[in-house]
Regions:
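Conserved donor-binding/catalytic core segment of Leloir-type glycosyltransferases
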Residues: 4, 199-227, 238
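Carbohydrate-associated surface elements
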Residues: 41, 162, 182
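Short alpha-helical donor nucleotide-sugar binding micro-motif in glycosyltransferases
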Residues: 85, 270-271, 277-283
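Membrane-proximal helix-turn-helix segments that form the acceptor-binding/catalytic region
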Residues: 109, 137-155
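Acidic anion/phosphate-binding donor-loop and adjacent secondary structure
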Residues: 182-203
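Nucleotide-activated donor-binding/catalytic signature segment of Leloir-type glycosyltransferases, i.e.
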Residues: 247-271
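Aromatic "clamp/platform" in nucleotide-sugar-dependent glycosyltransferases that forms part
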Residues: 291
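Conserved acidic donor-binding segment of nucleotide-sugar-dependent glycosyltransferases
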Residues: 324-335, 344-349
């Protein structure tokens, strides 16, 4: 079976979508499928390149912002896309942008079947410019994605039930199957097997959050929660990540320190996976504030070593599915509610210890090997339908 993955930049770092695509392709190859990638060039000149390579495309005025988000776009070069589609038995669409629209159009013309994965909400795009609440922009974008990409697919993979329900409300024509993007089991075990925790900072309590410094991750809500927490003086906040809002977050943190709201300056840093594993083993709580999140597996990666999370709950974020109690959820963008939940868990250390044990190994439920079996089943089902229709 020859499968073509279509993604703007398969090799982008600090981009959850590209990372998910790389894991999926690797596992599909291990399962014996012939998988090739249609993508832009690898930003690492010494790294591997896609089998079908597209030129880089820079968006006027917005290119700097796009790249700060760990993202990049490729040119929809018809000749290369046609060559790639002709090679494949089935085309797997990973995004709903220009190269995917072109691939869908060409695949339909050549009679090649399409499947897709829904990785992004329109709000993910517009949150960067403060338009995540705009019904006009988000509604138009969703209709365009649906008409030009997803309705041309026979099956669309929905990483969560939350996503499936949204697509059903928009009357997507494709069959919708809920399949997690999945986590690599070996990586999960490695995280739990670390013997030496690495404590950084000087707080009585260490609270960590992991993710891009971007608007939709809503990290300012965690900082603002310190205004309402009775434990603020004893809390060391650790922000693991990077992104376009780094200066704004640092400034807000400095203001809180200067006003005496918090005594211990928050730590901002980008850490290797090995460092994240060691830091995570020495924290008391994990906070996930994102109000737009298709799945949020970075949260599960962290908490499955045995950390109690407090996760934002909202209309367009699915991550609160990982919370095992109501005290591990807070209303999105509500810093007071978050502070109350933080104080609750810090006030009840024994209960927190018992609760943390419940999360150990929870990531097994999201083992990517299970996801790969279901994705391969999609391919087989779709190809069988096409063969039957051709008779």
């Amino acid at each position: 079976m020859k499968v073509l993955f279509v993604v703007n930049n398969f090799y982008a770092k600090g981009n959850g979508l590209s990372g998910s695509a790389r894991r999926t392709v690797r596992k599909l190859k291990e399962a014996g499928l012939d998988v090739r990638v249609l993508s832009g060039a690898n930003p690492d000149p010494n790294g591997p390149e896609p089998e079908f390579q597209l030129q880089d495309y820079r968006i006027p005025f917005f290119d700097r912002l796009v790249r700060k988000q760990g993202y990049s776009f490729s040119k929809a070069e018809t000749d290369i896309i046609t060559e790639a589609v002709k090679w494949a038995d089935i085309i797997h669409i990973e995004e709903p942008f220009a190269i995917q629209m072109a691939a869908c159009r060409i695949a339909k013309k050549l009679g090649k079947p399409l499947v897709g994965t829904y990785h992004l909400h329109p709000e993910n795009l517009f949150a960067s410019v403060g338009l995540e609440k705009s019904r006009i922009f988000n509604g138009f974008t969703m209709r365009m994605w649906q008409h030009m990409v997803f309705d041309k697919c026979e099956v669309v993979q929905c990483p969560t039930e939350n996503v499936k329900e949204r697509l059903e409300r928009h009357h997507f024509k494709a069959e919708l199957r809920v399949i997690s993007n999945g986590l690599v089991r070996e990586d999960l075990l490695t995280r739990r097997d670390k013997e030496s925790a690495m404590k950084i900072g000087h707080g009585k309590y260490n609270i960590i959050t992991i993710g891009r410094y971007s608007n939709e991750k809503d990290l300012k809500t965690l900082l603002n929660a310190m205004k309402y927490s009775k434990h603020a003086d004893d809390i060391q906040l650790i922000f693991c990540g990077r992104g376009p809002q780094k200066k704004k977050l640092r400034h807000l943190a400095a203001v809180l320190v200067s006003k005496g709201i918090i005594k211990i300056p928050p730590i901002f840093g980008f850490y290797s996976l090995d460092e994240l594993q060691k830091i995570s083993l020495a924290v008391d709580l994990y906070i996930h504030c994102a109000f737009i999140e298709v799945e949020g597996l970075s949260c599960m990666e962290a908490i499955q070593i045995g950390i109690v999370p407090i996760i934002a709950e909202g209309k367009h974020t699915a991550t609160s599915q990982f919370a095992l109690s109501e005290m591990s959820k807070f209303k999105e963008r509500d810093s007071k509610d978050l502070a109350e939940k933080i104080d609750y868990w810090l006030d009840h250390p024994q209960e927190r210890k018992v609760e943390a044990k419940k999360y150990v190994g929870m990531g097994e439920k999201y083992n990517i090997d299970n996801s790969i079996k279901q994705i391969i089943q999609i391919y087989e089902d779709v190809l069988a339908r096409h063969e039957k229709a051709a008779k």
